[in-house]
From Swiss-Prot:
Belongs to the Mediator complex subunit 19 family. It is found in: Nucleus. Residues 166-201 are annotated as: Disordered. Component of the Mediator complex. Component of the Mediator complex, a coactivator involved in the regulated transcription of nearly all RNA polymerase II-dependent genes. Mediator functions as a bridge to convey information from gene-specific regulatory proteins to the basal RNA polymerase II transcription machinery. Mediator is recruited to promoters by direct interactions with regulatory proteins and serves as a scaffold for the assembly of a functional preinitiation complex with RNA polymerase II and the general transcription factors. Keywords: Activator, Nucleus, Transcription, Transcription regulation. This is Mediator of RNA polymerase II transcription subunit 19. One of its GO terms (biological process) is negative regulation of transcription by RNA polymerase II. Signal peptide: none annotated. GO terms for cellular component: core mediator complex; mediator complex. One of its GO terms (molecular function) is transcription coactivator activity. Its main location: nucleus. It comes from Candida glabrata (strain ATCC 2001 / BCRC 20586 / JCM 3761 / NBRC 0622 / NRRL Y-65 / CBS 138) (Yeast).
Length: 201
């Protein structure tokens, strides 16, 4: 069965008539083997092939990565559930993340297309998507890494128009830049204050 028989055309967001050249190197390949790094990887592996513990992460290494985001002494996975309350979403295999749709013989092309579209939409609905958890995770990033988000004074999260509550409405609250735990007026409001002063003069 060819791809066109079960994948609707709306899946192709890039020009479908254009030829596609596979990326090189292909990230789906075993790049360690491709670049002949098997010996080195075995020497620094933290687990053996049979699953037993091998090389521990040296404390001196830990000191070198203390300022890196996403560092883990214990790597999160599905089994240890170190991913927190969103672990069940993070570590699911792709087929597990959505209900599978099977085409019955009496299903028309339009019914089949609608069924596939409903599956896509379900990814953004409960239980696949918890908007409160998403909002909590984004706010944690904002608090944990303030310099990454505040370096550019022209960047405002609200400009991204994230629909965090699933209502279709963006956050209309007044934007504020946080600095050392205090609120500071945005550049726009400072400009308005300057205009007010000139009027008084």
């Amino acid at each position: 069965m060819e791809m066109e028989e079960f994948a609707p055309s709306y899946y192709y967001y890039v020009e479908p008539e254009m030829g596609y050249q596979p990326q090189q190197p292909n990230p789906m390949e075993d790049l360690i083997t491709v670049y002949h790094l098997d010996d080195i990887s075995r020497q620094v592996a933290r687990t053996n092939e049979d699953g037993t513990k091998a090389v521990k992460l040296r404390k001196s290494y830990k000191n070198q990565i203390t300022d890196l985001s996403g560092k883990f002494s214990s790597i999160p996975n599905r089994e240890n559930r170190k991913g927190g309350e969103i672990a069940h979403i993070l570590f699911q295999n792709n087929p597990d993340m959505m209900n599978q749709v099977h085409r019955s013989p009496d299903m028309t092309d339009e019914q089949w297309r609608e069924a596939l579209m409903n599956v896509d939409a379900s990814l953004f609905q409960a239980p696949n998507m918890d908007w409160e958890v998403c909002q909590s995770v984004l706010s944690q990033f904002d608090r944990s890494y303030p310099t990454e988000f505040q370096n550019d004074p022209n960047f405002h999260v609200d400009d991204l128009a994230f629909d965090l509550d699933g209502t279709g409405k963006s956050n209309a609250k007044k934007r504020k830049n946080r600095s050392n735990g205090s609120s500071m007026a945005t550049p726009n409001s400072e400009m308005q204050d300057d205009v007010k002063r000139r009027r008084l003069e």
